């Protein structure tokens, strides 16, 4: 009986750990590097030098439906209006990382 309880406990711990681990984890530090090299010229500090009202600040992202990694990744991949498409220049992982970085920074009001 004691062995059965031990096996059950180990199985439960293993499943809990496995199920709580995300399928992928974005690298925010890499996202910061990608942002600095590709986005900061127009979006320094979460701003927007081309369209002043479409910033990367949390409120603007929410207002324009861009407050998810998927939405940001789509925009980076495909571009829109004055923003060029980066799909041919950045890898999928880099795009995922920069989206995570933007969301992370917007949650901190771009305060670092």
Swiss-Prot record:
GO terms for biological process: photosynthesis. HAMAP family: Cytc_PetJ (MF_00594). It comes from Synechococcus sp. (strain ATCC 27167 / PCC 6312). It is found in: Cellular thylakoid lumen. Keywords: Electron transport, Heme, Iron, Metal-binding, Photosynthesis, Signal, Thylakoid, Transport. Pfam families: Cytochrome_CBB3. PROSITE patterns: CYTC. Monomer. Belongs to the cytochrome c family. PetJ subfamily. One of its GO terms (cellular component) is plasma membrane-derived thylakoid lumen. InterPro entries: Cyt_c-like_dom, Cyt_c-like_dom_sf, Cyt_C6, Cyt_C_IC. Residues 1-25 form the signal peptide. Binds 1 heme c group covalently per subunit. The keyword Thylakoid applies. GO terms for molecular function: electron transfer activity; heme binding; iron ion binding. It comes from the Bacteria. This is Cytochrome c6. The gene is petJ. Heme c binds at residues 39, 42-43, 83. Functions as an electron carrier between membrane-bound cytochrome b6-f and photosystem I in oxygenic photosynthesis.
């Amino acid at each position: 009986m004691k062995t059965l309880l031990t096996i059950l406990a180990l199985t439960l711990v293993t499943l809990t750990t496995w199920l709580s681990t995300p399928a992928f984890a974005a690298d925010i530090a890499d996202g910061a590097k990608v942002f600095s090299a590709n986005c900061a010229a127009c979006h320094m500090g979460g701003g927007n030098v081309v369209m002043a009202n479409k910033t990367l600040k949390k409120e603007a992202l929410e207002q324009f439906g861009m407050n998810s990694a998927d939405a940001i990744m789509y925009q980076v991949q495909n571009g829109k209006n004055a923003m060029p498409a980066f799909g041919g220049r950045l890898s999928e992982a880099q795009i995922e990382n920069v989206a995570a970085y933007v969301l992370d920074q917007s949650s901190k009001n771009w305060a670092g």
